[in-house]
Amino acid sequence: MEDTVFQITNARLLSRVVEGIEELASDGADMMGDIYEYMLGKMAASGTNGQFRTPRHIIRMMVELMRPTLDDIICDPAMGSAGFIMEAAKYIAEHQGDELLNIDNRNRYRNEIFHGSDSDASMMRIGCMNMMLHDVDEPQLHYR
């Protein structure tokens, strides 16, 4: 992330952005992640990043057909913004939420289950941020 360019040059605007993020953080990671994905969708719709984004309803349908569990390893070899991985994480949290109360299961969920790779370094950063906003602390990511 050393090559990241910070484009908010106005100190007052930066302060407002940070305050807004802190307010969102108090509402939970799920809301922040949803907002992040919404903004990514707006970028894709305007052609800003040139990446293909699978529509949310298609992702949801595919994950529901897969029915992922805490015993699975979830891997997306062309992860982009990590939409598929995050939908799988959401499915697991909704269907095995009680099992996530166990510390070992929680650690596995946050650090071991989710794997992804992409050939675009910017998309890797976007996907990583998306995962972290959705409570996946140490995603297993590989730049290819």
Where are the language model's segments positioned?
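Non-catalytic, mostly N-terminal accessory regions of nucleic-acid modification and defense proteins
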Residues: M1-L70, P139-Y143
